[in-house]
């Protein structure tokens, strides 16, 4: 028997493959069809594989993609380039040593190791602003305001920069000089709400109010003593 030359294998049911670039030029499909995931490259490779026994279909292949190239090399430049995502390596939680981790302190974070333990911020809270402290150079007393420190230091130096222009009496504070001037003007702007008596200085009114408080407390104590005595007398007669 003589050897017979077998023809090239032809697929029984080749899928009909179309060149979408050619169809786009003929206005058969919208422009955005061949932009989806590189369909032109995909169908070109399939056309080169399945048109072995169909020479009439080879004209539909897209000339931009050579048939010798495999699919990944032909369609790689059509697919969008994705940059590798750098993920932060998170430490895995050790459930086996949960009790040990709960009793130990957290390792110091960079930037917080310089802080002292009392000034280190708590979890979930911002570090509180430290109050300004003004220290007296004579006795070491602390103040939160510079004006209060200035007035306090004048008690050590006996500095009295505010002088009355009538009697030339000097004062450490400006409000003390203002109250002193009411004495010369015979004006008494500070009135007591209980007895209506007027005073030239607010400090004198404050001392006067303490007298009212002492008097009211003494009268209340005396009234309580009288009630107690009356109750005791009634109990004895019964």
Curated annotation (Swiss-Prot):
It is found in: Nucleus. Transmembrane segments: none annotated. At the 8-somite stage, expressed in the pronephros, with weak generalized expression elsewhere. At 24 hpf, expressed in the kidney tubules and the anterior duct, and also in the gut. At 60 hpf, expressed in the tubules and the pectoral fin buds. A zinc finger (C2H2-type) spans 134-156, 162-184, 190-212. It holds the Pfam family zf-C2H2. Residues 105-126 are annotated as: Disordered. Keywords: Developmental protein, Metal-binding, Nucleus, Repeat, Repressor, Transcription, Transcription regulation, Zinc, Zinc-finger. SMART domains: ZnF_C2H2 (SM00355). GO terms for cellular component: nucleus. GO terms for molecular function: DNA-binding transcription factor activity, RNA polymerase II-specific; RNA polymerase II transcription regulatory region sequence-specific DNA binding; zinc ion binding. Disruption phenotype: Embryos show a down-regulation of early pronephric markers lhx1a/lim1 and pax2a/pax2.1, and subsequent defects in renal structures. In addition, embryos at 72 hpf display pericardial edemas and kidney cysts characteristic of kidney failure. GO terms for biological process: kidney development; negative regulation of DNA-templated transcription; negative regulation of transcription by RNA polymerase II; pattern specification process; pectoral fin development; pronephros development; urogenital system development. Belongs to the Odd C2H2-type zinc-finger protein family. Transcriptional repressor. Required for pronephric kidney development. This is Protein odd-skipped-related 2. The gene is osr2.
């Amino acid at each position: 028997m003589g050897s017979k030359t077998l023809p090239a294998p032809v697929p029984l049911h080749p899928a009909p493959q179309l060149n979408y670039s050619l169809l786009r030029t003929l206005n058969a499909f919208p422009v955005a069809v061949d932009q989806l995931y590189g369909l032109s490259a995909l169908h070109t490779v399939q056309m080169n594989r399945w048109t072995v026994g169909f020479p009439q279909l080879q004209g539909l292949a897209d000339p931009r993609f050579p048939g010798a190239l495999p699919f990944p090399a032909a369609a790689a430049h059509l697919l969008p380039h994705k940059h590798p995502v750098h993920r932060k390596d998170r430490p895995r939680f050790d459930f086996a040593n949960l009790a040990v981790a709960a009793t130990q302190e957290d390792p110091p974070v960079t930037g917080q190791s310089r802080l002292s333990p009392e000034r280190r911020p708590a979890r979930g809270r911002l570090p509180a602003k430290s109050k300004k402290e003004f220290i007296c150079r004579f006795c070491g007393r602390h103040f939160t305001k510079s004006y209060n420190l200035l007035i306090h230091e004048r008690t050590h130096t006996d500095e009295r920069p505010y002088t009355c222009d009538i009697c030339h009496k000097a004062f450490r504070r400006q409000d003390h000089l203002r109250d002193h001037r009411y004495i010369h003007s015979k004006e008494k702007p500070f009135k007591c709400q209980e007895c209506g008596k007027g005073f030239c200085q607010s400090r004198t009114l404050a001392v006067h109010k303490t007298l009212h408080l002492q008097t009211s407390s003494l009268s209340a104590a005396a009234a309580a003593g009288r009630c107690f005595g009356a109750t005791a007398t009634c109990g004895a007669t019964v």
